[in-house]
């Protein structure tokens, strides 16, 4: 007898892989191509952060891409032998063609495959999975679950800062001329990750970047963030020391007056580490109030 629902996501999430296996969640691997044409499958084994940092130290650069189309089709076909329905929630369509590829298959698997553009990544996807699981266990209607998924990004905000922008410049995610200007001025760019990346100002350096990020996030929610309106705060880190992580937690607590139990720490997904490099940091907030200042899709 088939199970009712499978949640299918991808390796842009921070979700624990063992937990996923035991909870009817499949994490599809995205693809990482090293500059020597070595293909790294982002499966949490080939793509461990330590391996990525070592490759960067050895001078390699990277390009990334979606799950190969054939692998995606095979995964859907296989899982529909085990499950009645698949809910697909992967990386934002602004970062990858992953969503478009899955959406194109929705018609072929009508009433079996349901694909939603999350406009998100990282811990926001992890949190979304938990919400879906909770609603399923409480017998919430499938229609209401899909409505929640479609609106989830209205309650999330993500900002990043990286100490070394070389990976972003080489990949074309920051134009070379802007990259040169940033290196000469020795400032740290702040990146707003909302559907896709947007420039969100500068910090004097990586040490002062968290303060700028927290101010930006608060502005997104019209300065209404506090312990009552925040569900979770995730600190995304790329090889930071435990001391630095503790400093960031204190920054979040002092800025939002939020309980420390609402703060989680996650390593950045490898699909992003290959661009932002070691020393980068990010902060993702999930609130129970909607954003007021939103970047329009274009």
UniProtKB/Swiss-Prot annotation:
Keywords, sorted A to Z: Lipid-binding
Q: List the disulfide bonds.
A: none
**Zinc found in the keyword field:** no
In which domain of life is the source organism classified? Answer: Bacteria
- Binding-site residues, hexadecanoate: 65, 96
* Residue ranges constituting the DegV domain according to the UniProt record: 5-287
Write down the Pfam families for this protein, in alphabetical order: DegV
- A molecular function (GO) term: lipid binding
NCBIfam families cross-referenced by the UniProt entry: DegV
- Annotated function: May bind long-chain fatty acids, such as palmitate, and may play a role in lipid transport or fatty acid metabolism.
What is the official name of this protein in its record?
Answer: DegV domain-containing protein UU535
Q: What is the lineage of its organism?
A: Bacteria, Bacillati, Mycoplasmatota, Mycoplasmoidales, Mycoplasmoidaceae
């Amino acid at each position: 007898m088939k199970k009712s629902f499978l949640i299918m996501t991808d390796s842009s999430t921070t979700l624990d892989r063992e937990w996923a296996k035991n909870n009817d969640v499949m994490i599809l691997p995205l693809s990482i191509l090293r500059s020597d044409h070595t293909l790294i499958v982002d499966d949490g084994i080939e793509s461990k952060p330590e391996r990525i940092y070592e490759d960067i130290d050895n001078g390699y650069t990277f390009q990334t891409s979606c799950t190969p189309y054939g692998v995606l089709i095979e995964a859907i076909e296989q899982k529909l032998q085990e499950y009645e329905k698949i809910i697909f929630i992967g990386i934002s369509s602004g970062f990858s063609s992953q969503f478009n590829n899955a959406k194109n298959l929705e018609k072929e698997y009508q009433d079996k495959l349901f694909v939603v553009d999350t406009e998100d990544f990282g811990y926001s996807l992890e949190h979304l999975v938990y919400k879906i699981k909770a609603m399923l266990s409480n017998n919430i209607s499938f229609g209401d679950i899909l409505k929640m998924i479609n609106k989830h990004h209205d309650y999330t905000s993500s900002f990043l800062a990286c100490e070394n922008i070389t990976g972003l410049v080489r990949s074309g995610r920051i134009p070379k001329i802007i990259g040169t200007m940033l290196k000469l001025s020795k400032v740290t760019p702040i990146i707003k990750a909302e559907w896709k990346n947007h420039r969100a100002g500068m910090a004097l350096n990586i040490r002062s970047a968290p303060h700028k990020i927290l101010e930006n996030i608060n502005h997104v929610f019209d300065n209404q963030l506090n312990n009552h309106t925040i569900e979770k705060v995730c600190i995304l880190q790329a090889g930071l020391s435990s001391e630095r992580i503790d400093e960031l937690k204190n920054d979040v607590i002092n800025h939002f007056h939020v309980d420390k139990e609402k703060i989680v720490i996650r390593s950045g997904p490898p699909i992003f580490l290959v661009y932002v490099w070691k020393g980068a940091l990010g902060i993702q907030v999930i609130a129970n109030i909607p954003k007021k200042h939103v970047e329009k899709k274009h």
